[in-house]
């Protein structure tokens, strides 16, 4: 793949002004990866999102609920960065998998080893009553194969919609990927937000981060 030079990289989906025909074979390509590329991608996306909240006075004093956070190596560096700026943030990291030990013993970080469902979200809402919640979701179930199936994706999106509806966060950053054309099952709803492109994404990627900078009732 040839590099493309531009004055400013595309940041959002609606900035893309061209298109390619879908070719199922492109998903079989194995692009070269940097060491820890996945964690670096998350670091860049979440630093952008949280910095914007900080500039608008939303971040200080908030509770960040991060669902699907493991291993979360990059979160330690996000936490240290905003702590050095004097911001008071409580982090609640939730995943059924184990987190990186680098996150152990941090007084402002709570690690919860659990897969999330609607009933747990309702319990969490009661525990965080009157807290200013910022929601980050990187839920990604996979029932076999190298990539999540369309049914996995739809289940994840339904759960994310439930999280936003119940927690009523001041802002949200939600992961989602549009099913490929030959894997489409049915139409679905996602919250209306700013559809940000992800760093290092291959040309066939249909994955974005949906950033919502408002606590107003969601629009699907």
Curated annotation (Swiss-Prot):
Record's catalysed reaction(s): a 5'-end (N(7)-methyl 5'-triphosphoguanosine)-ribonucleoside in mRNA + S-adenosyl-L-methionine = a 5'-end (N(7)-methyl 5'-triphosphoguanosine)-(2'-O-methyl-ribonucleoside) in mRNA + S-adenosyl-L-homocysteine + H(+)
InterPro entries to which the protein is assigned, alphabetical: mRNA_MeTrfase-like (IPR000176), Pox/kineto_cap_MeTfrase (IPR025804), Poxvir_cap_MeTfrase (IPR030375), SAM-dependent_MTases_sf (IPR029063)
Subcellular location: Virion
Residues that bind mRNA: 22, 177-180, 182, 205-207
CDD domains membership: capping_2-OMTase_Poxviridae
The organism's place on the tree of life at top rank: Viruses
Designated gene of the protein: OPG102
Keyword annotations of the record: Elongation factor, Methyltransferase, mRNA capping, mRNA processing, Protein biosynthesis, S-adenosyl-L-methionine, Transcription, Transferase, Virion
UniProt entry tagged with the keyword Ribosomal protein: no
GO MF terms held by the record: mRNA (nucleoside-2'-O-)-methyltransferase activity
Entry GO CC: virion component
Subunit structure comment from the entry: Interacts with poly(A) polymerase catalytic subunit OPG063. Interacts with OPG109 and OPG123; these interactions might help linking transcription to capping and polyadenylation.
GO biological process, one term: regulation of mRNA 3'-end processing
Gene3D superfamilies found in the cross-reference section: Vaccinia Virus protein VP39
Binding site for S-adenosyl-L-methionine: 39, 66, 68, 72, 95, 97, 116, 138
Protein EC: 2.1.1.57
Family from the record: Belongs to the class I-like SAM-binding methyltransferase superfamily. Poxvirus/kinetoplastid 2'-O-MTase family.
EC category name: transferase
Active site: residue positions: 175 (for methyltransferase activity)
Annotated protein name in UniProt: Cap-specific mRNA (nucleoside-2'-O-)-methyltransferase
Function: Displays methyltransferase, positive regulation of the poly(A) polymerase and transcription elongation activities. Involved in the modification of both mRNA ends and in intermediate and late gene positive transcription elongation. At the mRNAs 5' end, methylates the ribose 2' OH group of the first transcribed nucleotide, thereby producing a 2'-O-methylpurine cap. At the 3' end, functions as a processivity factor which stimulates the activity of the viral poly(A) polymerase OPG063 that creates mRNA's poly(A) tail.
